[in-house]
Curated annotation (Swiss-Prot):
Catalyzes the dehydration of methylthioribulose-1-phosphate (MTRu-1-P) into 2,3-diketo-5-methylthiopentyl-1-phosphate (DK-MTP-1-P). It comes from Stenotrophomonas maltophilia (strain K279a). This is Methylthioribulose-1-phosphate dehydratase. One of its GO terms (molecular function) is zinc ion binding. It catalyses: 5-(methylsulfanyl)-D-ribulose 1-phosphate = 5-methylsulfanyl-2,3-dioxopentyl phosphate + H2O. The gene is mtnB. Keywords: Amino-acid biosynthesis, Lyase, Metal-binding, Methionine biosynthesis, Zinc. Transmembrane segments: none annotated. It comes from the Bacteria. It is an enzyme of class 4 (lyase).
Amino acid sequence: MDTTTFPYDTARLGELAQLLIDNVRELAQAGWTPATSSNFSHRLDDRHAAITVSGKDKGRLIEDDIMVVDFDGKAVGRPLRPSAETLLHTQLYRRFPEIGCVLHTHSPVQTIASRLYAPQGHVHLEGYELLKAFAGNSTHEMAIDVPVFANTQDMNVLSKQVDDLLDRQNLWGYLIDGHGLYAWGRDMAEARRHLEAFEFLFHCELELRRLHG
C-alpha cells in the first residue's frame, strides 16, 4: 500500500485536476492550445498550485497530467516537469492571495494581436460594453491598456517585467509578443470570463483595423 504523504490536500488536488481537465479540454476544442502549447493552473492552498505538466496535448489531459508546484515554481510531491513558464503563474499567486486561477492560451487572434501591437507595447481597449466583463468594472465608459511584453525564454526576466508593471497598473491579463495571452481571476469561472472577454475584444480591434485599412 502506498503510504506516501504529501504537503497538500490530495483530495483537493483531485478536484482541481478534474476542473482543469474539463475547462482546458473546451479551450483546446476552440483551437486555443495548438501543438501541446499553453499552460493552466489553479491555486491549491496558500503555498501550492496545481498546474498542467509540460509537453502534453491539452485536449487529452488526464489526472496524472496535473502536478503540484510551490510558489517558487518547483515541483512538489511527484518528480514531474512543469511548464517553463510556471513562474508566470506562481508570481501571481504569491503576490495576490485573491487570485485563484491563471490561464495561458495561444489562439490565432491573441497571437496576431500580440504581433501587431508589440511596437506600441499595448492594446488600447475603450468604449466596449464587454469591458464590464473584467472584475471591478461597471461601465463601458472606460479604457484599459493590455500590455504586450517582448518574448523571452528567460522567465526570471519576464516575471520581473510583469511585477514592475503590476506595481503601477491594475491588470486582468497581458500578451507576450508572438506568443499568447495570460489571464487570471479569483476562480476558474472568473479567469475564463476574462480570457474570453480579451479574445472577443482583440478580435474586434483586429477587425476594425482590417476594415479601416
